[in-house]
Amino acid sequence: VRNLLPFISSHPGGRSALTCRFRCGDACFKETPNTSDNEYAGDIIARAVSRRSVMRAAAVVTVATAAGTAALTGPSAPQAEAAALAGHGSKPGRPQKPGASGARGLRFSPVAPNKDDKVTVPDGYAQNVVIRWGEPILRGAPAFDPDKQTAKAQAGQFGYNNDFLSLLPLRGERGRQVMVANHEYTDEILMFRGYDPANPTREQVEIAWAAHGLSVVVVQEEHRTGKLGPVNRHPLNRRLTATSEFRMTGPAAGSTLLRTSADRTGRKVLGTLNNCAGGTTPWGTTLHGEENFNQYFANGTTAMHKRYGIGTSASERKWERFDRRFDLAKEPNEANRFGWVVELDPYDPDSTPRKRTALGRFKHEAAQPRLTSDGRPVVYMGDDEKFDYLYKFVSSKRMKKGNSRAAREHNLTLLDEGTLYVAKLTGDSPVNEIDGTGKLPNDGEFDGSGVWIPLATGTTSHVPGMTAEEVYVYTRLAGDKVGATKMDRPEDVEPSPRTGRVYVALTNNSDRGKEGKPGADEANPRNANKHGQILELAENWDDPTSDGFAWRLFLVAGDPDDPATYFAGFPKSSVSPISCPDNVAFDAHGNLWISTDGNALGSHDGLFGVATHGDRRGELKQFLTVPTGAETCGPVIQDRRVLVAVQHPGEIDGASVEKPASAWPDGPGKIVRPSVVAVWRKDGRDIGV
């Protein structure tokens, strides 16, 4: 194999240079795309009046919108903000939500940090590999042979680098579920013997196209255990790749900004790329976030290309040599057709997946809906880039219950109409109490309030100087214009099914506090932030459609012995160390589960559980660790099973097919393969509690 030289030094968060290059195109080592001069949270805090002082004075607070002309009162008043975070999702004068005070916590013995080349689970738990990269799932697909790979074979096999996972019920087939998986990116160094990154072959590129995308696989559970395995050639099984057909829908579909020489309609797209996390909808579909799509394109020429991190020269992967659509000098709009949330109906293998333009275009990490009291979906989303933004979408349509054809057809339109918002956060502590070290302010919490700034509703833009189509296609620029708060890489965003609170994983930001970059603020309280934090957000009056919210930091990650860490006030002597929170999920008891990406503490990545309410709130426990070089992705927490995607095992600088850094999952002498793993309790009881 020819070395990838020159290698950039290891990622400041702990990830290898090999991972950085193939997953996100070395985004952390390039100039931050957000160079807008909108206010940083620190600037806002410097002028903010302490909310506690205002409340003590019984004054009325008005919060200006980005344009400075409108004010939010009523639900955005301090009383609503305080009530939103008081107790557990309570409303003024109303009881807490059922079961919120009866949290059970997590009662397993935590796994110690380690560097073992295996999946390590707690005592009393068992595991199995559900499916590996390359296993056949479609009729006619051959068994995997790393030395006989073809694009045709890969298009019928489980894809590479599994990320987001979802398990959906399958009526009428006992013990079976439908598993949907993202395949975020390929690492050809670990896929092909003798791979030359400067001169990939057409065959290698076409195999990589087929290894991207999504997989739908029916899985069967083994009687009396938690084991899962694929049902090969099931009629619902499906592969979607970088060359499959997708349809643009919503208010920007058909826009001139989405048209190319191959698609004069602006509605038909080939492929989905860099699908990271996602979500499962209440109406039985799955959502998939297109994240670091910029790395696949060459020769960016416009300011919009630059704002999305697209380079001005050849791409790392060299795909433009084999398909002109990846050369923006020839097809300047092709990149605009990526960076969306994809909706897939896993129960209809003949359906065309849809890219939902109403949810905006940016580096989507995930998209997890919740329903309002009247049945409208609200989707929370993070843009995974340093100093980028937090968003939500509120649908104007109500979900129809049931599984009739009419209900399903209607529900497949829910994410095409509504209002797209971006968040602006304000801290409530004096600016001199936020010093960049992570030291808590005098009130004992990093907290504050915020507003949701509307960007567009249908074909109406709320951003001066931008049309609605421009808002949807260039959503980052819209956020810049209205002064959204720049965050530390907002990734997965999930609402709790028990309390309604929303949890935002902010993975890290090594640039915070550097010369010419914004320093610490109350929502992002550490300079050179290696370990990240988790923000807890409560919509005013528990209303997901509210234009205001209260927030506080639930966790400030790192070594518990570090005074700059915080675990919701729980004694730090009793918690596990954690670094770089990425994906989050909930169990039925309201416990939050966190997977990590790029452990800067030196041990392997893992999955962690933590109670979000009750007496054990903040008690973080490590549930598992993954093998050498791997990332923990896509956690699914069922009552009696945990599912995780073990992504890029063995992805260590200098590793290759010939010189593997890991022997997982099949032992020495076998090629390293990203895989899905199931974990269960040996006694058959509920996970964790």
Label each region the model flagged.
Residues A153-L167, R264-A277, K481-D492, F570-A585, ...:
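Signature of short aromatic-glycine-proline-rich micro-motifs recurring in repeat-based ectodomains
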Residues H212-V219, R337-P346, F393-V394, K530-N540, ...:
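Beta-propeller blade signature
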Residues D116-R132, G140-A153, R224-G266, L344-R361, ...:
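Blade-edge beta-strand/turn elements of extracellular beta-propeller
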Residues V1-V49:
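N-terminal secretory signal peptides
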Residues A103-P282, L287-N294, M304, I310-D345, ...:
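Long, well-ordered hydrophobic secondary-structure segments characteristic of membrane-embedded
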Residues E135, V342-E343, K386-D480:
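Extended catalytic-interface subdomain
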